[in-house]
UniProtKB/Swiss-Prot annotation:
Signal peptide: none annotated. This is Large ribosomal subunit protein bL17. It comes from the Bacteria. GO terms for biological process: translation. Keywords: Ribonucleoprotein, Ribosomal protein. It comes from Borreliella burgdorferi (strain ATCC 35210 / DSM 4680 / CIP 102532 / B31) (Borrelia burgdorferi). Disulfide bonds: none annotated. InterPro entries: Ribosomal_bL17, Ribosomal_bL17_CS, Ribosomal_bL17_sf. Part of the 50S ribosomal subunit. Contacts protein L32. One of its GO terms (cellular component) is cytosolic large ribosomal subunit. The keyword Ribonucleoprotein applies. Pfam families: Ribosomal_L17. Belongs to the bacterial ribosomal protein bL17 family.
Length: 123
């Protein structure tokens, strides 16, 4: 039995967990803010921070590496042109988690994940 993994399994199989995280990260970059349970958002935060760090250097290699995880061209372009330029001087801590309290139905800890700074308005 493997113990002390470097991530939370979220009570899902690996393919389901990967699909969940991929969809949540894409929604996060699309809306710049998402609300969910605290444990899910901790995992989303880890992925989002890694992707933003990778997107700070706009090369063909980095675009191809991120396109493995983000399949939507518009979201990928938004990440490279609007979100990552804001964080060029920052070496980490691109997101903020605001705790909301417990959910009524099952008392799960809820939170909001958002970007620390607002993305650029490129028109």
């Amino acid at each position: 039995m493997k113990t002390k993994l470097g991530f939370n399994r979220l009570s899902r199989k690996s393919s389901h967990r990967r699909a969940l995280l991929k969809n949540m990260v894409i929604s996060f970059f699309k809306h710049e803010k998402i609300s969910s349970t605290k444990t899910k958002l901790f995992e989303v935060k880890r992925f989002a921070e890694r992707l933003i760090t990778r997107a700070k250097v706009d090369t063909v290699h980095n675009r191809r590496e991120l396109s493995k995880f983000i399949h939507d061209k518009h979201i990928l372009n938004k990440l490279f042109t609007k979100i990552s330029p804001v964080f060029r001087q920052r070496s980490g801590g691109y997101t903020r988690m605001i705790k909301l309290g417990k959910r009524y139905g099952d008392a799960a800890e809820m939170a909001i994940l958002e970007l620390v700074e607002k993305p650029l308005k490129v028109e």
